[in-house]
Amino acid sequence: MSFDSEVSNWKYSNFFENKNYRFDKKDILKILPKDDIDEAYNVISGWDNYSSTPLRSLNKLSTKLNLNKIFYKDESKRFNLKSFKALGGAYAVEKVSKGNKNITISTATAGNHGRSVAWGSQKLGLKCKIFISEHVSESRAKVMRSFGADVIRVKGNYDNSLNECVKQSEKNNWQIVQDVAWPNYKLVPKLTMAGYSVMMKEISNQITNQKISHVILQAGVGGMAAAMVAGIARYLDHVPKIIVVEPESAACVLESIKAGQIEKISIEKESIMGGMSCGEVSLVPWEILKNSVDYCVTVSDKYI
């Protein structure tokens, strides 16, 4: 079955229009500044084996839906890490290490972020400690170990692994490189988001003769979605409709936008969309997403 025929079978379960929508480029670029976005692209585009990932056209689906064009950004070959996450964690490692070979990098992860941090640490010859919960598969742990990381499994869920990471990092003076923000910890998540914004720079180079009408973004804690919104503010001369998609069982962005404030939700059953099964929006992404998203949509696991 082709990708576009699979997509044509997707159905949404919830749809919400943001009543507080107010896309303001200046406000967005105060949170994730233009200079930070530009620097991320300049650094990452200089890495060995860098190339823009493909923007693929879903011709069958666009014909079926009577739309001009539908594109999807194919991140499956990004630095051979098979995820856009390669842009974020590894870039943050490079920025926070500042050429110091004696520091130890640490992070908590459900998979792809840790893989990026491990890879970024290996590139720079840094020690790396990665904390994972008991729910993370051994195959994912094995990949992170293949990049030289010391993988530490913690009983409980992701929050338990993050708490242990913070505890051990404070005790051992390790540098945490986390993609989730909390009070007094916002710089590194912003660096991670700046890395993700490279995708929007590439898209702006790949679509040069037409305007983008809609951008559909997946969301877990919101970092990638907010980074792409900032990229839109930086690189596009128009504002497309922005739609955030989440698992039905973990719609923390939708519920927060509906409430007008961050709402922590209880996840009764983990979604098969593992990296998106998140119960709370991260602080920095929320500052961007709360007014910049037009619509929120959820999708049930049975349609994935």
Language-model segments: residues:
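PLP-dependent amino-acid enzyme catalytic core
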Residues: M1-I304
